[in-house]
Amino acid sequence: MQANINWLDNPEVFRVNQLPAHSDHPFFRDYREWQKQHSSYQQSLNGKWKFHFSANPMDRPQDFYQRDFDSSNFDSIPVPSEIELSNYTQNQYINVLFPWEGKIFRRPAYALDPNDHEEGSFSKGADNTVGSYLKRFDLSSALIGKDVHIKFEGVEQAMYVWLNGHFVGYAEDSFTPSEFDLTPYIQDKDNLLAVEVFKHSTASWLEDQDMFRFSGIFRSVELLGIPATHLMDMDLKPRVADNYQDGIFNLKLHFIGKKAGSFHLLVKDIKGHTLLEKNEDIKENVQINNEKFENVHLWNNHDPYLYQLLIEVYDEQQNLLELIPFQFGFRRIEISPEKVVLLNGKRLIINGVNRHEWDAKRGRSITMSDMTTDINTFKENNINAVRTCHYPNQIPWYYLCDQNGIYVMAENNLESHGTWQKMGEIEPSDNVPGSIPQWKEAVIDRARINYETFKNHTSILFWSLGNESYAGDNIIAMNEFYKSHDDTRLVHYEGVVHRPELKDKISDVESCMYLPPKKVEEYLQNDPPKPFMECEYMHDMGNSDGGMGSYIKLLDKYPQYFGGFIWDFIDQALLVHDEISGHDVLRYGGDFDDRHSDYEFSGDGLMFADRTPKPAMQEVRYYYGLHK
């Protein structure tokens, strides 16, 4: 198979040769590696890569992936990073509009005409910048002789991959992992990996989030050595019985490779006591159903108690091939007949924030230090929940939320705001995904990868279909996907407020943005058909949060109201050196000669971009502390 640049224009092509999405569990060679938190089955490709920037697809070096290509004039760039922050092209912040509006006329393929697939819209787009990446590497000794996969944890926005001159695959969706099999083309020494990253594709219509518009390989890249028999996926569904005391353990395992030998499974409590032990022969698919644990310790924000699952995989000679450790909790979220959201049988109150991934120097290429700082800030200020606005976050974030009792609304990478709202008016004539058949599989795929990757994380209480994408048959299909795959969580989507006739088919909860307290109360006083929340409220721009108490009072009056997520947690601003003053300063939208611009609308956080809390954080700490 050869790469085809026209895939950029086709909403029905979004992944080529990509391995099926699977759970994000780690795997180690043995217990010693687990203790050191270093797996010899993983080889990082982070660091300096050779790089060439092109202003558009026509100017890109088309054969750069060939082994005999002369790349001596290429620059170098760190991976992970944003291309724009290496000064190759302009930084641009924008809220609703698409970056090309006012310069290039585009409409989503098939949106206005079922026969118009907008050929050349992006593949020949004069504004579609291209990053050509090259990386030479030798396999680590632990990977030699094994099947080898490569995992890109995040690439904005569309990428083609080659190894040693051979086309490997294509992927869109900037914020979920993309994994490919390199085995047919891998060498022990002197491998040449080539990645071509386009800033725009049909995925751009689905990734119109309120943020700086970056591109590049902005999350980690690693090689994975696959043992002869390997646990590729596990689906863990611990349930809480109706007495809210006992736990029911359910697990599905999917093995690949030789699928021979046996596995040893253990479940232990925090004191090391074994609650379950099994030894079974390996088959492609194994199920463990309805194992009852009496008087389990329930997981919640105040007491994030996690049990330890250990799976040891052995070959036919009883040699240990891999160890899979995973922590999980028992918790139960549901809606009562009175339309009250309950966690473990008790009323749930969300003291939440929306959180973009952000670092003032690195953009969305954040670090583990950023994440742990944010978790600590949550706990210091009585924030118990986070909405991953408006895309899946880095994998370690979900583990931190499990461990620290942070309730997660896990949102898909979907926002098509500019396709249905123009100049402040609702005008959905070219809305995607809408009900357009050619866009259906692309958005279901985004739901699938979000689910499959993060399905085992106890902290996730809600799946969110996306943000500000209007509503139609394709949003309904996403809702149905989650309901058919997961009955242990609730589904959320706010955008259906614009299509109230679809509310019975989309979202388990009534969700609004910035609805004034009086309007919230009107809903709650009129026999609400669903529990109510504000997925965005208390817009924290400038001197704000002064009216927060009016919302918090409603929590005491109406149990059907279960709180909301403040917009938002951290400013999106970049720390740059000012040549005139000689100081490092934070710059916002519009400060980079970027037009159009929503200017300081990028600064809506409870914290400045350098993670200094704003005065409004005091209000949050006080009011969220009233309902811990």
Curated annotation (Swiss-Prot):
Component of a beta-galactosidase. The keyword Cell division does not apply. This is Beta-galactosidase large subunit. Keywords: Glycosidase, Hydrolase. GO terms for molecular function: beta-galactosidase activity. It comes from Lactobacillus helveticus (Lactobacillus suntoryeus). PROSITE patterns: GLYCOSYL_HYDROL_F2_1, GLYCOSYL_HYDROL_F2_2. The keyword Hydrolase applies. The active site is at E468, E536. Its EC number is 3.2.1.23. GO terms for cellular component: beta-galactosidase complex. Heterodimer of a large (LacL) and a small subunit (LacM). GO terms for biological process: lactose catabolic process. Pfam families: Glyco_hydro_2, Glyco_hydro_2_C, Glyco_hydro_2_N. Belongs to the glycosyl hydrolase 2 family. Induction: By lactose. Part of an operon consisting of lacL, lacM, and galE. It catalyses: Hydrolysis of terminal non-reducing beta-D-galactose residues in beta-D-galactosides.
